[in-house]
């Protein structure tokens, strides 16, 4: 009996080894330089074992590529062709975009799937959609992020930002010994903005700190060990996940957002309510609200899942990603007092020019140094660590006289953080220097070396929204407070090694010093 057990174990181990190492010679067979993978974990073992931050691992892999323009790496069993040359990035994302239209098919659903199945909303989002479905949805959503729409949305952001600072002044208990948990503060702000601009809800998470909308959002965006393992399985065992119907996100939270969107659509239709937010725009796209414009432009019938998914991913991306940008901005201003002082002087000047009136969209868009500061934060701490593309038809690249063939199904990887921290493109990359993005210097930045929101037609559709949110928060905080190091501040900043999110060990803590 014991021998039978050992025999079965040996067979299982052999089968696992064969499966786990099946792609190990992928780059060797093509004559492409690569980093030797660890069995099953590829080159990401440190991240999955929670020993190193993914951000640091990707930066190291980029550096190991040396002078190679293409360099092979592995994410678990998945071979990724890392691109280390700006000209090749331009070719992939612009010139030959028709070969690289899609992100890889990790979460995506097909048009044949049950349109009423809400278990995989991320798979029906704009990010995961493919080919013609992506193009149609991109066209549907684009009007929501034009300059005129941003101007309308800014009125709401402005109000929420003022309320957030007012709550700090009114309730000192939320600031422990003048030390503020910036992550908590910023996620509450992004939560309230998105509640209104996407879902049509009025929420104040600074006063009603346990409101349902905020609590459900926290559940969705907090990456526990189990959540990280689910992500790992989604990447490694896509087919099995579909058979077993593994749900990536908490079911209760997902169902909450599904009902929120569908009930809002039903109520608005019954009561003829029109509101300038994402739900209204998606109702127009679906034909629930008929306008001359939508009659002329309707090209596809969207399902309930398609509609809900766009609101869902807008919340998911905005809740966490925008908040992290705000937190890193505050942290860098705290560590670089000279930069903070110069930015404060710009804030003072704008405040004086407004003569007691509310901050306007035009005023904040005209703040050049604030724009430089935020751009430099995005260079040093890009939320999108890397950008991927899946090849949909064979193509051959001529790289320094060598023919490199990329086949249908191959995955291209553009390491954002690697380029942003490469001294070849950004001198002294670890220095926080907003002057890189001044009018005099920004033209010298080599094209396709700075892409915090992606590149080409598949860049982040909500980038302008995220930038506007971050600028509003920093403006109001800096107007009334100086950022100083707190006892809990992580200096120098070290990233946590758990999960996929960018965050310092111990969190984002800032000491607020009241200005006279």
From Swiss-Prot:
Gene encoding the protein: Cyp9f2
Compartment(s): Endoplasmic reticulum membrane; Microsome membrane
Membrane-topology descriptor: Peripheral membrane protein
SUPFAM superfamilies from the UniProt entry: Cytochrome P450
Record's keyword annotation contains Repeat: no
Name of the protein in question: Probable cytochrome P450 9f2
A Pfam family the protein falls into: p450
GO cellular component: endoplasmic reticulum membrane
Residues given in the record as heme binding sites: 460
Iron found in the keyword field: yes
GO molecular function: heme binding; iron ion binding; monooxygenase activity; oxidoreductase activity, acting on paired donors, with incorporation or reduction of molecular oxygen
Role: May be involved in the metabolism of insect hormones and in the breakdown of synthetic insecticides.
Disulfide bond annotation, renumbered to this chain: none
The enzyme's E.C. designation: 1.14.-.-
Organism taxonomic ancestry: Eukaryota, Metazoa, Ecdysozoa, Arthropoda, Hexapoda
A GO BP annotation: wing disc development
Swiss-Prot/TrEMBL keywords: Endoplasmic reticulum, Heme, Iron, Membrane, Metal-binding, Microsome, Monooxygenase, Oxidoreductase
Family: Belongs to the cytochrome P450 family.
Cofactor: heme
